[in-house]
Amino acid sequence: MRVDDLRQYIRDIPNFPTEGVIFRDITPLLKNPDAFATTVDLMAEAVSSLNVTAVAAVEARGFIWGGTLAYRLGVGFIPIRKPGKLPFEVVEKEFELEYGKDVLQIHKDAAGPGDSILIVDDVLATGGTAQAAADLVNTLGADVAGFCFLLRLGTMDGYERLSKLGKKVFYLLTV
């Protein structure tokens, strides 16, 4: 299976979660073992030159790709979560969304100097969530090696925003 073959497993759901939004549903891709394996293999191949020490991902769908990619790369996994979900001491970052603000947290001992972290999520839209995740990793003294996504929303400026950080930005498909 090739990267373009994955498109058939991404379902568009119009007007979800709100009117005018097209939600990209990846559950058909997750259900198909060949498509799922191909996605993980292609992501691993794309980032193989980065020499990362861990993969960090934002809940919830980022965990799917982050966890499997960390396993495939043979490195650790770092969860980045919404407030109140992590049991140990945390560092947090407030960031802007299209219509408001949100907060992400990471355990304060999740990474540190000398670590090279790959940030993974399912969709790259504005880049706000990924940049907040990168800011958290940097706050811990670790380096962000790059970013990896399944989908890039071509009508949004997230790729340009993250590219300005001077890190590699990988994605498999533009929708």
Curated annotation (Swiss-Prot):
Lineage: Bacteria, Pseudomonadati, Coprothermobacterota, Coprothermobacteria, Coprothermobacterales
Documented EC number(s): 2.4.2.7
Presence of keyword Calcium: no
Pfam families xref list: Pribosyltran (PF00156)
Broad enzyme group: transferase
Oligomeric form and interacting partners: Homodimer.
GO molecular function per UniProt: adenine binding; adenine phosphoribosyltransferase activity; AMP binding
GO BP of this protein: adenine salvage; AMP salvage; purine ribonucleoside salvage
Protein name (database record): Adenine phosphoribosyltransferase
The keyword Cytoplasm belongs to this UniProt entry's keyword annotation: yes
Organism: Coprothermobacter proteolyticus (strain ATCC 35245 / DSM 5265 / OCM 4 / BT)
Primary role: Catalyzes a salvage reaction resulting in the formation of AMP, that is energically less costly than de novo synthesis.
Gene3D superfamilies the UniProt entry points to: 3.40.50.2020
Cellular localisation: Cytoplasm
